[in-house]
Amino acid sequence: MIYVLYSPNCAVCKKVVRFFRNNQIEITKIIIGEDKIERSMLLDILSLCEDGFGTIISFKTESSKRLNITSKTFLDLSTKELLNLIQNDLNLIRRPLIYQTKNNRPYRLQIGYDSEEIEIFKRAVHEK
């Protein structure tokens, strides 16, 4: 299963959604600012991040500015606090975030749009 966490008004996010639609690859869309994600999904996403929360948190969003979360201050927060913050406000994460599971386990993560890197998701159709 492939999940795309995105904002509908983001041009890069639209490219990602269009890529999957054009290649007839089924995705589950999660709209940042409207939808919520389970804590277990967030933990699975983090398990694919080399730098943990630093990989997925955007320090440029209105939410991070409002909460005074910077690349330095987030280090003072506990894992539980960061999980709660992100679960309560998905606007804290970078977008688009593409998360793939295989056999119900975390498998692949891509943040942003790269026309070459995103091609790897075409294999998802054949890996079922």
UniProtKB/Swiss-Prot annotation:
Gene3D superfamilies the record matches: Glutaredoxin (3.40.30.10)
InterPro entries noted in UniProt: Arsenate_reductase-like, Thioredoxin-like_sf, Tscrpt_reg_Spx/MgsR
Cross-referenced Pfam families: ArsC
Domain of life: Bacteria
Keyword Isomerase among record annotations: no
Keyword Disulfide bond found: yes
UniProt keywords, alphabetically: Disulfide bond, Oxidoreductase, Redox-active center
GO molecular function: oxidoreductase activity
Disulfide bonds: C10-C13
Assigned protein family: Belongs to the ArsC family.
Matches recorded under PANTHER family: ARSENATE REDUCTASE, GLOBAL TRANSCRIPTIONAL REGULATOR SPX
Protein name: Uncharacterized protein UU176
